[in-house]
A protein has these predicted regions:
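Transmembrane alpha-helix segments characteristic
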Residues: 339-361, 370
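Membrane-lumen/periplasm interface segments of specific transmembrane helices
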Residues: 45-62, 223-236, 240-330, 345-350
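Loop-to-helix entry region of an early transmembrane alpha helix in multi-pass inner-membrane enzymes
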Residues: 102-109, 113, 117, 125-143, ...
Length: 419
């Protein structure tokens, strides 16, 4: 048999250059360090969000803060961003302002000082306030994405952990991480605290909790998380040793977290002389909905359910029943297999923060943003690997992000519903 016949009988397929190129890109991507991947994901998400922000800003009409079609920095400095600017420049009032009805009016004491302080420090470099506020927010969000990836790697494979970062970076309220808000700094502390808790590096929680308590509310919810963590470890101490020294450390950190959680209301009291100054300040924001009412724990969601149902023309009991269904659904969600993969500590946090909100928060237009510290749930959403699922959820979150920008963040005439 000739060589030609052998060659013709076993023809070799020429390599497809496009296929090789695709494989090369995949290989190069897989070989990148984890932090480079997270950086590229976060940057791509922020670029996408910036495009949407600019588009929505073009639709913005004149309002009490800006003219029509404001630039990016002006559009990113609406709503509560102005309160942070007021705090950064002028500090807090020594006397609580009063509304026409004699109750405490909306004022700067509702906002914690670390974010405006960090932004004011950045202005010492010569940056204008609005630019500094965005830079601090974007940088903190990037840090949160990096820490979240490390946290997810404790429970998920690398591709799933990275996809969790993708979902975090494009979530419906993720634009807040490039606006003049403290949320992204709060996300950083939440992610760091959970990572330290999972790794049982309890002592390092002290500075993180302290920073958290002066950035965003939620430290008291984390105190409950620490309590649940202690009970869990003590109950399982036979198979997972829980030495007395560690028990004392967890108790000490838990008590410190409780103190940190109450520190700001105590400071408001000390400066203004009004014992319930912080609580009354927070109640001012919900008075636009239900008028001035006392805070009774575990009732705000039912009040809100009744109000929203009546607002859309339904009986109040429909809204109250809906709240009950939501509460049961949230509790059941914690036991789904995908959520259980995240470990007990993350589930303790989800339960603690959910209970914290259920106890004191009145559901209003800012509900989506207030729910954002539940972001570790993206780990459960990242578990399925099917391409159709991943593309679908990415497109859904991007669509919801645009809806949040256009329907919640954009100011519409006389808009009393801050995002």
């Amino acid at each position: 048999m000739s060589a030609d016949s052998v060659n013709s009988g076993s023809a070799v397929r020429e390599p497809d250059p496009y296929r090789v190129s695709r494989r090369s890109l995949r290989v190069r991507w897989r070989l990148l360090p984890w932090w480079v991947k997270v950086t590229l994901v976060y940057l791509a998400a922020r670029v996408l969000t910036t495009i949407m922000v600019i588009e929505v800003a073009r639709q913005q009409g004149p309002n009490s803060w800006t003219g029509a079609k404001p630039g990016y920095l002006d559009f990113a400095s609406l709503w509560d961003a102005r309160w942070y600017e007021i705090i950064g420049i002028g500090g807090y009032p020594r006397e609580l302002p009063l509304a026409d009805d004699g109750h405490v009016a909306e004022n700067a004491w509702a906002f914690l000082p670390l974010y405006p302080g960090a932004t004011e420090a950045a202005t010492l470099l010569g940056l204008p306030w609005k630019l500094a506020a965005v830079i601090v927010a974007v940088t903190a969000g990037y840090g949160a994405a990096l820490v979240l990836h490390r946290l997810m790697l404790r429970f998920l494979e690398p591709d799933r952990a990275l996809f969790a970062v993708v979902l975090f970076s494009i979530a419906p309220v993720s634009p807040i991480m490039q606006f003049g808000y403290a949320e992204s700094l709060g996300f950083l502390w939440v992610a760091l605290a959970l990572l330290l808790l999972v790794d049982r590096r309890y002592g390092w929680l002290v500075p993180v909790v302290l920073a958290w308590a002066f950035t965003r509310p939620g430290a008291l919810a984390f105190a409950l998380t620490l309590g649940l963590h202690f009970v869990w470890r003590w109950w399982h101490r036979d198979r997972d040793p829980f030495p007395p020294r560690e028990q004392l450390v967890v108790i000490g950190v838990g008590l410190f977290t409780v103190l940190a959680g109450f520190a700001w209301p105590l400071i408001v009291w000390g400066v203004t002389g009004q014992v319930d100054g912080y609580t009354e300040t927070e109640l001012a924001w919900r008075s636009a909905y239900i008028g001035r009412q006392e805070l009774v724990p575990l009732t705000p969601w039912f009040q809100g359910g009744a109000w929203w149902a009546t607002w859309v023309g339904l009986p109040a009991w429909v809204g109250i029943a809906a709240v009950g269904v939501l509460a049961v659904g949230f509790a059941a969600m914690l036991f789904l297999p995908a959520v259980r993969r995240l470990g007990v500590d993350i589930r303790f946090w989800l339960a603690s923060y959910g209970l914290y909100l259920f106890a004191v928060f009145f559901p209003q237009s800012s509900t989506f943003r207030i729910l954002a510290p539940l972001f570790p749930i993206v780990g459960a959403l990242a578990v399925p690997r099917a391409r159709w699922y991943r593309w679908s959820i990415v497109l859904l979150l991007i669509a919801l992000q645009y809806w949040w920008l256009a329907g919640v963040w954009r100011v519409d005439d006389y808009d009393w519903t801050p995002p």
